[in-house]
Amino acid sequence: MDNQSIFQYSLETFPKKWVHLMERSEHGNRFDTNTDYLFKLLYFLKFHTYTRVQVLIDICGVDYPSRKRRFEVVYNLLSTRYNSRIRVQTSADEVTRISSVVSLFPSAGWWEREVWDMFGVSFINHPDLRRILTDYGFEGHPLRKDFPLSGYVEVRYDDPEKRVVSEPIEMTQEFRYFDSASPWEQRSDG
Amino acid sequence: MTVPATRNDLMIVNMGPHHPSMHGVLRLIVTLDGEDVIDCEPILGYLHRGMEKIAENRTIIQYLPYVTRWDYLATMFTEAITVNAPEELGNIQVPRRASYIRVIMLELSRIASHLLWLGPFMADIGAQTPFFYIFRERELLYDLFETATGMRMMHNFFRIGGVAADLPHGWIDKCLDFCDYFLPEVAEYQKLITRNPIFLERVEGVGFIAEEEAINWGLSGPMLRASGIPWDLRKVDHYECYDEFDWEVQWQKEGDSLARYLVRISEMIESVKIIQQALEGIPGGPYENLEARRFDRVRNIEWNDFEYRFISKKPSPTFELSKQELYVRVEAPKGELGIFLIGDNSVFPWRWKIRPPGLINLQILPQLVKRMKLADIMTILGSIDIIMGEVDR
């Protein structure tokens, strides 16, 4: 069984209302689903005999600020039994809560923490939803498109206070943007 | 005289971010009942550098120097996956000679990574000697890399469509010499370590992962293969030119730390086999022969053909990523290293998600140490083989 048959089989088997978009391409097949049906779809994919997608490879968050439901959460899955991969995607906005799949795939624990930390998408029923990669006491969700690359605060060790302090960022050099796509020579005065 | 009372409550001990061994900055908060471990909580994020956000603002060629800093011991794999992603997006074929050079570099990098896993693993257990031996071999690898790529560790060697430069004169002979030198060295390690009773006491039966558990927790790489599942992306995905070589997937059934050690040692030997076959079968042969044939009096079209090329140093800096999503993966020495790439019809990717094997493999640590003694934590942590550079990105 390869990618296409597992995709085709699952399409024919589960209720149509579970996916509202499917796409197949040579780069991988994907299902787009609603947050309500996400857990059911993953449960089906994991336990059904002819799909047996037992390995959760990756949970990825993507930010499309131009859309109404700006975040998209992508679950990359792998079936070692049938050697095929499939992607399940759902969209969410800042306040939607997605049901956690930790009970299905234990490896989702840290991935969901990372999506929460980086994007701000929270998960219901997650045993331990807190920040994982950012600093203690960090405010904001870094991978959103409206968060600047340099961040808002910088840290330094303050000798009088004998600890590390966070201060608003101080740029000693003006930000220079180099347009790599344009063939014209870039000059700093624009 | 009052007799001091013995307290029975649990101790919470912090194994702070700084470690004497080379795992990197990982903080473990361990709850102990005497010598038994009740719970262990890893805290990450000390090496988080925002690699994914930086990727959204760099072209691929600008981003290549960053990627070697994820897994800084197996650098060729991070570069390989960074160029594999746009290559698959744009359906770019890689010449066969470049593919062979890539495979040779990747397997040398795998040997280097497993060597530098072995040293700190033995040092954590208490044996200091192998640490020096592995660095002796690693220095030879650094020399090979330096002559081929210019840098000892952070090579920046791979390009979209091939490699940056062809192998220098005499490199193939040097590499074959290294392979001949290395195999008896691995035998020396095995004589020193594998049947050593102290080592076996520390390592056998420690950190057992059952087959079902390994699949559920999403493990990959040697951790999965040591639990009885012969899953190797090089065989399963048929990428680069691994199919042209004769090699086996190394796996064990026991699932404890000893099995992981055995898998990695045999992977090193298998890598040497692959390298020897690749060096003998490289299209065009050593660079001096290829050069001579190209400049031959009767100009033979074959030696200038696509298959005998590497790619030169300057692909277009404005390589546009089309608006597609794809997930590429490679069998890194630690596990399955993957990139989920969403292009945006521009030179910058819209989303560059790194799937590090270390993050997933580390997640199982709290469960593994639950019934173990304090000293076993380091053994298990060492056998998982993590690099915080890729866990935290």
UniProtKB/Swiss-Prot annotation, chain B:
InterPro entries for this protein: NADH_Q_OxRdtase_suD, NADH_UbQ_OxRdtase_49kDa_CS, NDH1_su_D/H, NiFe-Hase_large
Biological process according to GO: photosynthesis, light reaction
GO cellular component: chloroplast thylakoid membrane
Record carries keyword NADP: yes
Highest taxon of the lineage: Eukaryota
Signal sequence segment: none
Bilayer topology: Peripheral membrane protein
EC number, as in UniProt: 7.1.1.-
Catalyzed chemical reaction(s): a plastoquinone + NADH + (n+1) H(+)(in) = a plastoquinol + NAD(+) + n H(+)(out); a plastoquinone + NADPH + (n+1) H(+)(in) = a plastoquinol + NADP(+) + n H(+)(out)
Keyword Plastid (UniProt): yes
Record key words, sorted: Chloroplast, Membrane, NAD, NADP, Plastid, Plastoquinone, Quinone, Thylakoid, Translocase, Transport
Cellular localisation: Plastid, Chloroplast thylakoid membrane
Recorded GO MF terms: NAD binding; oxidoreductase activity, acting on NAD(P)H, quinone or similar compound as acceptor; quinone binding
Enzymatic class: translocase
Stored SUPFAM superfamilies: HydB/Nqo4-like
Listed PANTHER family: NADH DEHYDROGENASE [UBIQUINONE] IRON-SULFUR PROTEIN 2, MITOCHONDRIAL, NADH-UBIQUINONE OXIDOREDUCTASE 49 KDA SUBUNIT
Family assignment from sequence similarity: Belongs to the complex I 49 kDa subunit family.
Oligomeric and partner information: NDH is composed of at least 16 different subunits, 5 of which are encoded in the nucleus.
Biological role: NDH shuttles electrons from NAD(P)H:plastoquinone, via FMN and iron-sulfur (Fe-S) centers, to quinones in the photosynthetic chain and possibly in a chloroplast respiratory chain. The immediate electron acceptor for the enzyme in this species is believed to be plastoquinone. Couples the redox reaction to proton translocation, and thus conserves the redox energy in a proton gradient.
Name of this chain's protein: NAD(P)H-quinone oxidoreductase subunit H, chloroplastic
Species this chain originates from: Amborella trichopoda
